[in-house]
């Protein structure tokens, strides 16, 4: 049963049993609680002493109507009650809930205006699966970083009121309670809200954690909050468009309130990867056949090439394929507005560090939790332990040749769509030659390429003989040794890859998690161990082959859940939301 709460409601009772109009009003504002099911809504009004002052059940046939901008009247027999809400916004939320409960169509919310109904239904249905929540919770980097950020900044939570947007299982709400929060309002629009309620009760936190079913754009809170927490990030940070819901929640935030995460940085850098480029072209060559069972398919090859190159590639890669220092685009969640994310334009100018073909742009993101005690970073950079967000690469149909010392400029433009994703337009030009290339991509339909094996370095990465070095070490040859003696640096500082730094937010503030001694800033050499296989505790066998991990397909990715595997290529709904060409895929 869904429950919503409204504070500051005034009650006026009106009757004419004796032929005279009689009025009685409660002097103090009341707390209104509305409990909804499919056929009825139960309305309970309580005073500050939590004594029930008025209770009724509103059915489809109950006589009721709105009065003015923020009042509602209900007639029960010979008497009527007038409910006056604290604000028009509160009344609008209450009125919409009541209309939906009575089988009427409510007013469209901001979320409904920006989202196709079919996309929203599939999205929230997917997040109602415990298996999907498990996949995200088992991302140790994600979950551990959130807990560390909250507990290390416990002064921001101690005796404070917290809002958890899109709480899912409620794990972040529990972290806030661990940090001493006085009250946590956990908002969840999927059926996972029921499971979160079970966990709250079983952990004896029902007095401090209140689960509120519904979309944050449509619910009401009984009070303003001191801090908002959420995990709204998708692929390339923006996919799923949940960041807009996160920003919308600021209507509940006190003027001096905080947000965890506080800022988000998107990084992009040019890369070279001939193998990936040829893979996409090779797949399209199926349609080049002049006689497939006697049918000429070649007329569709051009369309097939366009379709395959419209797919962003979700996987991880060796940092040495990057050809220039990354460009950073920052979103300050405390300052940004929802409409700022409708159209995101990222201009770039790369100073090429290596010569070769530029096959596209690689994207990843970092978010910072800027607390009163310390700043903690969650990074999805290719130098860091792998997360379920991986990295994303966008190919150019026509690669660009650039020399070391050249500059490549252009724009990455992200346009929000009603499928809870973005259409991506990339235009790039080598300034010295005038060579230009572009591509249009659909972030809703990525290609999941991650196989669980260690990413291969680009060709030409050895500056001494690996065979000779193998025997010079006495015949003992490990992966880390082999890379260490290849002539490449034994450590890469992330600052050499990620451009820009802030005065209050720096990479040096990132807190290492876990027991892996190579977890922080040890670069591609020592990260070999942590990046083999997949994320810890995800069920994927470390170092397993593609065939060992699940159904055979190039689109295998973290983690394969047989429950979500449908016909055709191997499909998992375990990563941030995206929809391959023949299925649905959500997650964050």
Curated annotation (Swiss-Prot):
Q: Which reaction does it catalyse?
A: L-arginyl-[protein] + 2 S-adenosyl-L-methionine = N(omega),N(omega)-dimethyl-L-arginyl-[protein] + 2 S-adenosyl-L-homocysteine + 2 H(+)
* Keyword Methyltransferase tagged: yes
SAM-dependent MTase PRMT-type domain location: 120-427
Where is this chain primarily localised? nucleus
Cite the GO molecular-function annotations of the record. histone H3R17 methyltransferase activity; histone H3R2 methyltransferase activity; histone H3R26 methyltransferase activity; protein-arginine N-methyltransferase activity; protein-arginine omega-N asymmetric methyltransferase activity; S-adenosylmethionine-dependent methyltransferase activity; transcription cis-regulatory region binding; transcription coactivator activity
The GO annotation for biological process reads: chromatin remodeling; methylation; positive regulation of fat cell differentiation; regulation of DNA-templated transcription; regulation of intracellular estrogen receptor signaling pathway; regulation of skeletal muscle fiber development; replication fork reversal
Which InterPro entries does UniProt cross-reference here? Arg_MeTrfase (IPR025799), Histone-Arg_MeTrfase_N (IPR020989), PH-like_dom_sf (IPR011993), PRMT_dom (IPR055135), SAM-dependent_MTases_sf (IPR029063)
User: What does the function comment of this entry state?
Assistant: Methylates (mono- and asymmetric dimethylation) the guanidino nitrogens of arginyl residues in several proteins involved in DNA packaging, transcription regulation, pre-mRNA splicing, and mRNA stability. Recruited to promoters upon gene activation together with histone acetyltransferases from EP300/P300 and p160 families, methylates histone H3 at 'Arg-17' (H3R17me) and activates transcription via chromatin remodeling.
Q: How does it assemble?
A: Homodimer.
Q: How is this protein named in the record? A: Histone-arginine methyltransferase CARM1
Q: Specify the species.
A: Danio rerio (Zebrafish)
Gene that codes for this?
Answer: carm1
